[in-house]
Amino acid sequence: LDMLIKTLRMENFRQFRGTTKVDFSCDPDKNVTIILGDNTFGKTTLLQAFNWCFYGKVNFDQRPDFLLNYELSEEMRNGEQQIVEVEITVLHDGTEYIITRTQRYNCTNGNVRGESVPTIKVSYKQEDGQTESVKATQVDNVINNILPEDLSTYFFFDTERVSSISSRRDVAEAVK
């Protein structure tokens, strides 16, 4: 699995209001990025952003279907629209991919609701530097080629889960 995450960009994702960008280490000798912080400051939300961007899934205890920043949603007026967006730039087998998942939220009669289905786009840079979009029918295949969902738990985990990775057999099963 030859994958290197370059950047994570979040727009209004849960407690991250506005644009938040994280640049990850791409140094071949120092390619591990550790995110430290106090409890409730967003480390787990960063992991959830990866899962949502790649697979459209989150695992939040409170309001798991509502990803828009709460403060921003409280300020919305009738007819206004806001977006939640997560974009990941990743190098996979020498090709740079940009994966972007977007959810629009509308305020109608004082209620803020997300549109029924988030959109996902995947593009990649060709050797000549031009960006090409992946066909919608191939998006899931491309994402699973970059990082199969079954393996994602071994790449994106918080320290509380380290002890739950019980054996190499678990990893071997996920790889199969």
Where are these regions (language model features)?
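Glycine-rich phosphate-binding loops of NTPases
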Residues: 61-65, 69-70, 96-153, 167-174
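Short, solvent-exposed loop/turn segments at secondary-structure junctions
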Residues: 163-165
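A generic secondary-structure signal marking the coil-to-beta-strand transition
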Residues: 31, 82, 151-153
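Pre-Walker A-like glycine/lysine-rich segment at the N-terminus of P-loop NTPase domains
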Residues: 2-52, 175
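A general secondary-structure signal for short beta-strands and their flanking turns/coil
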Residues: 2-3, 17-19, 81-85, 96, ...
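Conserved P-loop NTP-binding catalytic core
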Residues: 33-36, 47-111
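A generic structural motif
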Residues: 11-13, 89-91, 96, 123-125
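A short hydrophobic beta-strand->loop->alpha-helix junction that borders the nucleotide-binding pocket
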Residues: 157-161
